[in-house]
């Protein structure tokens, strides 16, 4: 009986943890979207890259989420693997 209760508790905790992760993923900033005011919230595998432009004599920072080199490599290898499988 103790094992059954432990299994149920573990299952519930796992579901709570997974739902929290999926909410974080939904709230992240996708590729090529602005992240100027929230530079830490780009989706996994992305970094916030900033450019500086001069508008009316004043410098302005514009940032956007961009895939990291590691993520680009993983995507290319995954695509190549899918092509080889078919």
From Swiss-Prot:
Ranges spanned by the short sequence motif Processing quadruplet motif, renumbered to the chain:
23-26
Indicate the residues removed as propeptide on maturation.
20-26
Cite the post-translational modification comment: Contains 4 disulfide bonds. Cleavage of the propeptide depends on the processing quadruplet motif (XXXR, with at least one of X being E).
Name any one Pfam family assigned in the record: Toxin_35
Annotated localization: Secreted
Taken from the UniProt entry, a GO cellular component term is: extracellular region
Question: What tissues has this protein been observed in?
Answer: Expressed by the venom gland.
Which keywords belong to this entry? Disulfide bond, Knottin, Secreted, Signal, Toxin
Signal peptide span per the entry? Answer: 1-19
Main localization, broad class: secreted
Disulphide linkage map: 28-43, 35-48, 42-65, 50-63
Which top-level group of life is the source organism from?
Eukaryota
GO-annotated molecular function: toxin activity
Task: State the family named in the UniProt similarity comment for this chain.
Answer: Belongs to the neurotoxin 19 (CSTX) family.
* Notes concerning its domains: The presence of a 'disulfide through disulfide knot' structurally defines this protein as a knottin. The C-terminal part (65-85) forms an alpha-helix which probably disrupts target membranes.
Q: What this chain does, per the record? A: Insect toxin.
Name this polypeptide is given: Latartoxin-1b
């Amino acid at each position: 009986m103790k094992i059954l209760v432990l299994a149920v508790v573990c299952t519930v905790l796992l579901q709570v943890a997974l739902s929290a992760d999926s909410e974080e993923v939904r709230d992240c900033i996708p590729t090529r979207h602005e992240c100027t005011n929230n530079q830490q919230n780009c989706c996994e595998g992305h970094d916030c890259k900033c450019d500086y432009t001069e508008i009316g004599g004043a410098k302005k920072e514009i940032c956007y989420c961009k895939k990291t080199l590691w993520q680009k490599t993983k995507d290319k290898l995954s695509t190549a693997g899918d092509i080889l499988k078919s």
